[in-house]
């Protein structure tokens, strides 16, 4: 089993953990429908950046 040779200081431990923070996902509001969706993703109605890119199943 691997054992560290020297104790890691609190500063180095903190630097090691600096990338472990949780990030809130970016949420956008569709200007045409007002629905929320993840950034760079299509809204549930099939709109992206103000344009309808997918047709709804009810319309097809």
Curated annotation (Swiss-Prot):
Record keywords: Ribonucleoprotein, Ribosomal protein
GO MF annotation terms: structural constituent of ribosome
Residue ranges, compositional bias (Basic residues): 9-19
Pfam (any one): Ribosomal_L32p
Keyword RNA-binding assigned: no
UniProt key word Ribonucleoprotein: yes
Chain positions covered by the region annotation Disordered: 1-22, 34-60
Signal peptide annotation: none
HAMAP family the record matches: Ribosomal_bL32
Name the record gives this protein: Large ribosomal subunit protein bL32
Organism: Variovorax paradoxus (strain S110)
